[in-house]
């Protein structure tokens, strides 16, 4: 191979012409030349390679290309992100927005979602993707570990969303979705001292401490991972019970104009378990303080 | 709202009709209509559940089962590059608008996509939602997306100053986080229509949130070291546009004056 192994390794790359063009452009216009002005759109995965190649081409040894990874974000990367966002949005506009323009036009006037969804902020459990909600279907709140604070206390973020969706939008269903391998629930289960306020995460997940207590009461002999899974589900029921503590939610559930559902998405085996709160049966239980009764449980797989 | 049970209501109706039998036809028509409505309500509920079931099975067949490598990896851990704050509004799911695939973005959604300033007790909710992706998952980008026709911002703009709290106690308590945006718009844009003021406030509120992000020490230190980029955006679904901008925050090296 010749004196510039970089170029030859590029040529074995199926996208070589693209990367090569990038390098040449860089050489002509200097290292600060922005990728934005090249005519060719260079996919993100190959931008990273191109950056590596640039370092290699500058005469440093291949070993030093390792340093190129994990380096602080520089201005060039920022331009990449803008470009990436732009492509993403234009794809949405072309493939979805323009195709369904009438629907979007109606939505612009008002939304009338049938669902309020409370889900975790975890990147793997987006309700739109996993349950196919389209724009206009579901008013969606996402927080750490899909927790619902009690009516009487706690941060107002989730509570404001409950107020708006139930009292103004008049949603007919509330769906609380928990999931497998939840970092928030894990943090809750690992917490030793509930007064530990060193971190925000602890300050927040302590909202779910009743779920942890009920889990420890029945599952403390299980492996920690299984305890966490138990707590993930217990926490959903605990949140549903908390929802009934909001007077205007309980009123609507009692009248039959609002239903409360729990959902558990297991992304390890891709199953979705769903159940509905049986309000009539729960009323008796509520007096004993022992949780809620459920019905219509099913598992989709 | 009446707390009378339906049995009491039917009993009362029966008593009335036995006294005034000429109301029989009217009653029959109304009862039929009510029964039809109740049946539809019930089937709507069934439809709602069927809807999400078919949504899930569609996802499983067309996405999950076609990308086993991706989903096996995600089952073990997540490495999202983005932390996104978006409104809970049903029309603005970031996965739709920006086509985020599962695993790409940690997404927090609340009323009017707000980030309050650092407060360990009052705002532990958002604090946790920042702390986890930034300090544990090491996301590289934060994106706060505002949008058109935002009910939360409209509510903020409509609050009269110095009035007693209304029945929307939680909403008002939450949206006043962006009161600085409202105050600025009321001053700078007082000649614009209420609607235009709201649009400006939607964007200004994003800027207030971007500023509030810097009140979190773990955010600020990463921004200064260039390990974390902060951007704001505004999605206008009336016009079909998306504006994107960046928060530029850095300290320059000091130079000695003496």
Swiss-Prot record, chain A:
In which tissues or organs does this protein occur?
Strongly expressed in aerial tissues including leaves, stems, flowers and siliques.
Q: Look up the EC number in the record and give it.
A: 4.2.1.1
GO terms for cellular component? chloroplast
Q: What InterPro entries does its record include?
A: Beta_CA_cladeB (IPR045066), Carbonic_anhydrase (IPR001765), Carbonic_anhydrase_CS (IPR015892), Carbonic_anhydrase_sf (IPR036874)
Major enzyme class? lyase
CDD domains from the UniProt entry: beta_CA_cladeB (cd00884)
Q: Which UniProt keywords apply?
A: Chloroplast, Lyase, Phosphoprotein, Plastid, S-nitrosylation, Transit peptide, Zinc
Places the protein is found:
Plastid, Chloroplast
The family note in this entry says:
Belongs to the beta-class carbonic anhydrase family.
Please report the name of this protein according to its UniProt entry. Beta carbonic anhydrase 5, chloroplastic
Organism, as annotated: Arabidopsis thaliana
UniProtKB/Swiss-Prot annotation, chain B:
Fetch the InterPro entries from UniProt.
Answer: Beta_CA_cladeB, Carbonic_anhydrase, Carbonic_anhydrase_CS, Carbonic_anhydrase_sf
Give the modified residues of type Phosphothreonine. 35
Q: What does this protein do?
A: Reversible hydration of carbon dioxide.
**Which UniProt keyword terms apply here?**
Coiled coil, Cytoplasm, Lyase, Phosphoprotein, S-nitrosylation, Signal, Zinc
Which GO biological process categories is it annotated with?
carbon utilization
> What EC number(s) does the entry state?
4.2.1.1
This protein's name: Beta carbonic anhydrase 3
The main location is: cytoplasm
Q: Write down the species.
A: Arabidopsis thaliana (Mouse-ear cress)
Looking up SUPFAM superfamilies in the UniProt record yields:
beta-carbonic anhydrase, cab (SSF53056)
**Could you say which enzyme class this protein belongs to?**
lyase
Residues modified to S-nitrosocysteine: 201
Q: Which domain of life is it from?
A: Eukaryota
